[in-house]
């Protein structure tokens, strides 16, 4: 009998009942809530005269709509947009009514949902984790089965602590070898998406493995699992190991004492068996990965920084040719244009993909002693949580950014998506550490280029894309 994958083990451990239609009832251990996808769910509970089934399984924070500028210290009334203000206020009221733990807008523990749950230890190995946000796959970095859900499912989880789901296929993405200096987890996952496309992982749980993955910090693993959804997979996974356990130990929600010892022993099995069979296997050589830059309107439209934008005339497939032509037109780029000839109007370092302390350190290393280029209208750094912000300030990273000409902001989703005051104007090019570059994602007509934090900082100080390794070598010289 073949061994089991990590996904198989997590699924079986949480399968309450298998249904006649092939779906299963799955128990949910952790439910993370934010202000955008929860109001209707709470109202549904109220109309049905129900209460949350397990209050302590829920944790909430506002993130999508909150302003990241200093005036937010004035409280909810400082939120200018009426809909945004109402959503944040409604989350506060709903959590207060039902006794759900919420890190409110000006709580130091507030931040992006996918940053605050891991840093609190609320995301643990072996858990099932859901949130009304597609980038819930982030939490799979802990060996947890995590994925996004819709608003109606948010209500189901609140009411029953269960979800109906169908088991997916297993995909293994194996990345072996050593990453070159200046190449990061963000470059790995962008390279994966460039290789398999945004539909490559459809219908699969995507486990990342190999020596290059094992060498990553938890921050790096979260970055990779965060963007598994951009590769088509709802679920991203990394096996639990000593790195995972060291990160979790001592955090507020982590087990303590004897419970901790028992948990660590149980977590040792959160790996795929040596003889486990995967439906699909994808392999990459870490040593061959270069700093990546997206050039188009889909995450799969990504290239190494030393390459050129494709020429649609060279594409035989008419559908692909049309996609390239449309993307070039929207992005205001020319066929065969060098990636390094793309000039930036704005730079955004933040989002649930790249706003943790390691990300800010990497960006600060490039910004230190340099200045934001005069041609760049704005460069902002948005920590993923109040605790990340405080840590960065203890390390003096805020001073490095401010002296270089970056803006140092309060935590939130910020410029990742145009749901708050931080957004692009039409036609502006932005080097962004976020996860999506769809048309209008950062503002109507905005042109998004996905990169790592170090690459974003390098673009900020030069005004155009540059291989960050040139600046690293320059610093060392």
Curated annotation (Swiss-Prot):
Pathway note: Amino-acid biosynthesis; L-leucine biosynthesis; L-leucine from 3-methyl-2-oxobutanoate: step 2/4
Protein name: 3-isopropylmalate dehydratase large subunit
Pfam families noted in UniProt: Aconitase (PF00330)
Function, as annotated: Catalyzes the isomerization between 2-isopropylmalate and 3-isopropylmalate, via the formation of 2-isopropylmaleate.
Annotated cofactor note: Binds 1 [4Fe-4S] cluster per subunit.
Entry's EC annotation: 4.2.1.33
Record keywords: 4Fe-4S, Amino-acid biosynthesis, Branched-chain amino acid biosynthesis, Iron, Iron-sulfur, Leucine biosynthesis, Lyase, Metal-binding
Reactions catalysed: (2R,3S)-3-isopropylmalate = (2S)-2-isopropylmalate
Cofactor: [4Fe-4S] cluster
Highest taxon of source: Bacteria
Family of this protein: Belongs to the aconitase/IPM isomerase family. LeuC type 1 subfamily.
């Amino acid at each position: 009998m073949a061994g089991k994958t990590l996904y198989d083990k997590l699924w079986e451990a949480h399968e309450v009942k298998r249904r006649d239609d092939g779906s299963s009832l799955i128990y949910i251990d952790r439910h993370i809530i934010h202000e955008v996808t929860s109001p209707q769910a709470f109202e549904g509970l109220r109309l049905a005269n129900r209460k949350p089934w397990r209050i302590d399984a829920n944790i909430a924070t506002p993130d999508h709509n909150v302003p990241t500028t200093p005036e937010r210290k004035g409280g909810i009334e400082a939120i200018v947009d009426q809909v945004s203000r109402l959503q944040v206020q409604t989350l506060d009221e709903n959590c207060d009514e039902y006794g759900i733990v919420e890190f409110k807008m000006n709580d130091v523990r507030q931040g992006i949902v996918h940053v605050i749950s891991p840093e609190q230890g609320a995301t643990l190995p072996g858990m099932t984790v859901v949130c009304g946000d597609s980038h819930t796959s982030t939490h799979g970095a802990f060996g947890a089965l995590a994925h996004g859900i819709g608003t109606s499912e948010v209500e189901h989880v609140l009411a029953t602590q269960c979800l109906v789901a169908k088991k997916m296929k297993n995909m293994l993405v194996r990345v072996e070898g050593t990453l070159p200096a200046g190449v990061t987890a963000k470059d790995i996952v962008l390279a994966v998406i460039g290789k398999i496309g945004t539909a490559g992982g459809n219908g699969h749980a995507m486990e990342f493995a190999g020596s290059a993955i094992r060498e990553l910090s938890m921050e790096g693993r979260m970055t990779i699992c965060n963007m598994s959804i951009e590769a088509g997979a709802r679920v991203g996974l990394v096996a639990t190991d000593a790195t995972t356990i060291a990160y979790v130990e001592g955090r507020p929600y982590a087990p303590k004492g004897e419970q901790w010892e028992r948990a660590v022993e149980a977590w040792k099995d959160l790996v795929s068996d040596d003889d486990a069979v995967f439906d699909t296997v994808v392999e990459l050589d870490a040593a061959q990965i270069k700093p990546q830059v997206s050039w188009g309107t889909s995450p799969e439209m990504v290239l190494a920084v030393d390459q050129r934008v494709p020429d649609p005339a060279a594409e035989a497939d008419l559908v692909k040719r049309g996609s390239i032509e449309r993307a070039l037109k929207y992005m205001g780029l020319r066929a065969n244009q060098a990636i390094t000839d793309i000039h930036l109007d704005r730079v955004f370092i933040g989002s649930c993909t790249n706003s943790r302390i390691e990300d800010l350190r990497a960006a600060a290393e490039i910004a230190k002693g340099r200045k934001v280029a005069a041609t760049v209208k704005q460069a902002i750094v948005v920590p993923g949580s109040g605790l990340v912000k405080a840590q960065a300030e203890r390390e003096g990273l805020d001073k490095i950014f401010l002296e270089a000409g970056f803006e140092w902001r309060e935590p939130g989703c910020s410029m990742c998506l145009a749901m708050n005051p931080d957004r692009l104007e039409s036609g502006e090019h932005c080097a962004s550490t976020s996860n999506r570059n769809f048309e209008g994602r950062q503002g109507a007509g905005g042109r998004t280029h996905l990169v790592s934090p170090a690459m974003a900082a390098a673009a900020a100080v030069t005004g155009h894309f540059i291989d960050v390794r040139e600046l690293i070598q320059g610093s060392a010289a």
